[in-house]
Amino acid sequence: MNEPKLISGNANLTLAKSIARRMSVHRGMAVSLVDARVERFNDQEIFVEVYENVRGEDMYVIQPTSNPANDNLMELLIIADALRRSSADRITAVIPYFGYARQDRRAKARTPISAKLVANLIVEAGIDRVLTLDLHAAQIQGFFDIPVDNLYSAPVFALDIEHHFKGQLQDLMVVSPDVGGVARAREIAKRINAPLAIVDKRREKPGEIAEMTVIGNVAGKKCIIVDDICDTAGTLCKAAEVLIENGAVEVHSYITHGVLSGPAVERVTKSVMKSLVITDSIEPSAAVRGAPNIRIVPTAPMFAQAILNIWSGTSVSSLFETDTLVPIYEGMYQRG
């Protein structure tokens, strides 16, 4: 069986290189990115040229479709087309952050279901499988006519919480920032054996919060807000304020995808939150890396193992278990 081969667009080269390094550690052999050129013509058309022979190879395209979402999506599709026309045997799109996932349904009349359209485009480009992380809506997996492996941040976040709050777990309260995110927050609460609270928000219009109410007693607790996406951070920072007003002694947040657009970083640094923990599913900007209360949990170990499991035909769902991730993260976290 040929070794898996990785190729990357421009969306998150740092993560792609980290995945290659981690796979090298796991496999005991050198894994590097396939040599390719992904460029723009003067009119901003995307051009891809693969410099290595990929005929009959098992290819993994690492490309989150984050900001600029349209450019990064087109890069993914064109890379896949180049690989298919170069006779690659199988193409897996590794999409750490799946853009357009928030458009998974018609919220009002005469609007699109853009997530379904993107799924159709991915399939038509010749991609055989998708590997992603914390889809905004789990039902998006059903939009595809190809297999989709959706990894979860909950196991590694639970490990991180156990590590950073060692000896304080009894003081923690996991908080969902809205009713729709309860299942996600409950999963982490169950893993760390903590109670659950909910912030019920009433939204007047997108981007504007009219009212927030805390469901649950957070007095004297160190609150851990759990969500999948932080965009402008307005809702998150307001939720942190409301929790403090309701008696919480500290507020920390664990968010899978740090979109952090516009004034988000400034809001977070000035907020009452002691820390915001995100993954590197989206390439962190210099401002994000320099923020004193933002910390980044790497996803490369998890993606590297998932790719190896797909390649070898072994279980990907084994990565949903916290204990499985301990050796994968190589001493970064210790249990007990």
UniProtKB/Swiss-Prot annotation:
Q: Does the keyword Nucleotide-binding apply?
A: yes
Localization per record: Cytoplasm
Q: What is this protein called?
A: Ribose-phosphate pyrophosphokinase
Q: What is its main location?
A: cytoplasm
Q: Which PROSITE patterns does this UniProt record tie to the protein?
A: PRPP_SYNTHASE (PS00114)
The record's family statement is:
Belongs to the ribose-phosphate pyrophosphokinase family. Class I subfamily.
* List of residues binding Mg(2+) 2: D178
Chemical reaction(s) catalysed: D-ribose 5-phosphate + ATP = 5-phospho-alpha-D-ribose 1-diphosphate + AMP + H(+)
Q: Which GO terms describe its cellular component?
A: cytoplasm; ribose phosphate diphosphokinase complex
Q: Name one Pfam family in it.
A: Pribosyltran_N
